[in-house]
């Protein structure tokens, strides 16, 4: 490797998760040991991207389904929190650093994606400011450590895509989703509830506010499990649930639909659901987390 390899630093290490490799490794092992293996080998997972103290244990339920003896390349699709983006963007670097070990971007796949003309480049500043992809790097490194020399990653920052763009990107990524050696990591939290998020939907028939939030999230999760992008869009239009990874999820659902049209049999199941706290009053706020996995039969 030349000294000119460009790196993205682990900019959220030391704040959103520990910067100590040994501590991080032990933490991730601890959470993974609490989760069951039930949907292996996963072809895609949905997992949260909050600080690990909030969602580390939830995310483990998705990562437990990853089979390092099968997976060789990990696509990480994360929503853009800081820059307005109407398409998807690729990184400008070669290496993503983690406190565990460096992850190498698959430049061959990046080249093929770039050639489509559907992507833009994100600046290093945007790359390092964004946490939605980075929060999946330590878990990716941990679950793949037994095969780390064969591993490449394909980070993709997903913008505020229209439904037709979600369909186009879904179609493009479907050929990669068809390959058993690829894993898709879809980065998303679920409901952001409270006045600070300007979202306070409440169905009183559910009882406490946190129960209403759970019911709303699980309605959306049920639609995702049906792998139905149109229904998912309709659900978001109706309830406006603040699912920050709605566009990466939309891309996955469209990719899955494309493969199902071609006779590929698959199923998606959620394995864990959690809330950062239980909202009982209008002063409260919470973020929901869900972990799930897609398997191809």
UniProtKB/Swiss-Prot annotation:
Residue pairs linked by disulfide bridges in the UniProt entry: none
Quaternary assembly: Interacts with ERBB2.
HAMAP family the record matches: MEMO1 (MF_00055)
UniProt record similarity statement: Belongs to the MEMO1 family.
Function: May control cell migration by relaying extracellular chemotactic signals to the microtubule cytoskeleton. Mediator of ERBB2 signaling.
Protein known as: Protein MEMO1
Organism of derivation: Xenopus tropicalis
